[in-house]
């Protein structure tokens, strides 16, 4: 059901957002976890890697980022000359909160022979302390390019790091963070659903705990889950990630049934991200009208955080198991001096 689009004392929100977008030469980027009404008016809807690429390439003057704070910060870092607005600056992330920069810095200093492979769900300050940033859709391709004998710190998501360790036979040191949304999925409720829909595959995000992943037929990023759900021959798909992605599934494959795996005891909305939900059409309208709140970061911080992000963008096109594309990352001392460039991906 589509939410009402008129409020703020009768303002036609869709019409005004469209007008302001043109007037401001703005682009609206939205994550798959946003409410359907925001996804439907966005210029681009995608996962963190998709949206990072769009932010880096846009010729718009203003980026209206409908997501959470670390995503908007990433857009600002990659497009420092753009005005980046976030409808609600309180839209944070439990993973970001779990990894304070001073503690992450101390963790790095205690393990000087390790490079830091860091999940994008972190603050700009933690990115600046990292060697390479990854998203859930690029992590496997990037890890595949790092020599097996290179010691690695991975954070802040311990479940994604554990999944990568198991899949690649690695022994990365893991920061103990979790996503509160994916942590809430219930193994008991998942098994009930599997019994209710025999043969229906489970598509799970690697931020889920191992007991959810082990019952899943497919594990991948939001974009990979979406692709699987649309292309699968199965007519019923069980989805173990934030349920607002189901909106895109239903638009692309309306003849199929997509069922979100419950959290907790099955009677709560604890698998919906409370931070993503803070963004609304009303707040987006006000942000475009006032160009506030803006993401503002110190130039030196953006410069330091941009290097590991650029490595991610350069390395993300590698095909796992097909050999290195360009030079692999070698060791932490070369990364720290900035003498190793990320591989150049053909066609990008």
Q: Model-derived features: where do they sit?
A:
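Active-site loop-to-helix "anion-binding N-cap" substructures in soluble metabolic enzymes
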Residues: 1-239, 246, 250-261, 265-348
